[in-house]
Amino acid sequence: WDRLLYGVGELLVFGPLKNTLGMSRVRVAYTAGEAIGPELFDFYRSLGINLKQLYGQTEAAVFVTMQSDGEVRSETVGAAFPDVELKIAENGEVLYRSPGVFQEYYKNPQATAETKTPDGWVKTGDAGYVNEEGHLRIIDRAKEVGKMNDGSMFAPKFIENKLKFYQYIKEAVTFGDQKDYASAFINIDLDAVANWAERNNITYGGYQEIASHDKVRGLIEGCIMEVNENLAADSHLRSSQIQRFIILHKELDADDGELTRT
């Protein structure tokens, strides 16, 4: 019965959608570079696209980790390649070592010394950890990751991207580095929240009024609670659950120096 349903779905929905995406003949696909969100990864997998994640650098002779068949996870980049060693530095940065790593940067000994330790470990510049299954999970760039007062990892961009996955949240700024708990500034997406308000018979006069509405606060709080549930399931990030948040009464604006242009 499940195969029959999938066959109908492939004919009517999945097949045409894959064709629109130009992926109807793809047998296997890999994503690398900056990690895509697990929700987007799961979306492509749900279409029947054999999407996998890998992690590598030119300095590593390409691969450091890769997902193999039967070991695909939406939030990790796979286990270490054969003969590749992984190590997590005290600041959370991922280091690797293997017979295939680069010898040096051409005529640039300073850059070589900054990237490669005397005993052969290569600094990736990325923060992450190896989970119980031996799979590497990349959280963010190491320079963007801080620490809570309890010593646990705090990755603001990682949390902000999870918040902005919700249609009602346009921008999010999180705080937690060297603090006892995490907090957030939230910008609502006016169009999405306005549509929600109309469906729920909520009247308002402008951005400030709808942003301060109690029911809108409840809506955003529900999104934050879902993000917190996800963080709570991760032993490395559970201290980063958002304890307090403020919905801003104006949109963050590059003209006011609150956002960059890109």
Where is each model-derived feature located?
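Gly/Ser/Thr-rich phosphate-binding loop
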Residues: 1-72, 85, 170
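Adenylate-forming
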Residues: 101, 135-164, 193-214, 234, ...
